Amino acid sequence: MSGTLPPASGVPSPPGFGAVLETPEVSALRRRLHGRVLEVVSRMPRPLAEDVAALLGRHGRTRTADQGDLFVLFPAPVWSFLHWVPAARHPDIERLHAAALLLHLWDDHLTDRQLVPDLAVLQLRTELWRCLEQDTSALCAAWGVDPGLVARHTERYLCATHAPRTPADLDSYCSIAREQAALWTLLPRLLETGGRAVAGWSSLVEDFAVAWRLVDDAADVRRDAVAGIRSAVWWELSGAGRARWDAWSRPDGRTDTSGDVHGAAPWDGSEDARCAEGVGRVLARAAALLAAAVDRAAAAGEEGVVTELLTARAGVLTSARRPF
């Protein structure tokens, strides 16, 4: 879930989703989700809350949201389904899903040291978990859903992020990514189980989340290789390609703000070319997952989500046809 700087002139942009043209209502929802996170922040002690609000405000700032627009970092429909499912249009439900999305990102950035684990950062994580527990408990009671469903989703997420098993191939790599998306599929599953949404939403969000991981890996080949991360692309390389990838890694994986690893030899076009076939296969897998998500949305009659998914997939297909 990494952001990327604009490419230099003449350099192809990294692989990515097509830019979804949001309706005004969906854009308003996106900005509202940032406000739901600030509701959670407001529960923190004031000195910590001020620091966290300032930190969040620096992420995803836009012309129309000078206090921050955090969820521009998350592509639709991983959050926009809240607009398309009528039962999800409620402040408490929006806050629950905003907390679930941010928790995954927060944990990810804590793990890779993009965030300094100071008191404010750790307190927000605590408050996000508390929000998740309280709001899901209320929904389970209101909708007659077994609270064990929530426990199973949180356990899947924590097991997959705290001590993930070592994958054996791309299939098992994707399986782990599905487990790590368990917080994001929690609300869709509650909506389905509580009879508030047709079946298929949780699988749709899960397929999209895995596709996002694959597209992100395809965009971060250079960074992952020099950091010693065996991403999805690594699993699609030949034995010689994997050996070259591993040779690039450094024990500490320290990077500067440009993504360069200190002490690493320059990564030139030949290295990109050697990874191109693997990148193409990873993007093809992502496109297939998005196609499956399109089918689920179409079966549910959700034309708005179909449009979002087709637009996202078009960007992936364009990336897959482009030389790297």
Which role does the model predict for each range below?
Residues 96, 100, 291-324:
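Short hairpin/turn module used for nucleic-acid contact or packing/dimerization
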Residues 113, 152-156, 309-313:
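Short acidic/histidine-centered micro-motifs embedded in hydrophobic/aromatic stretches
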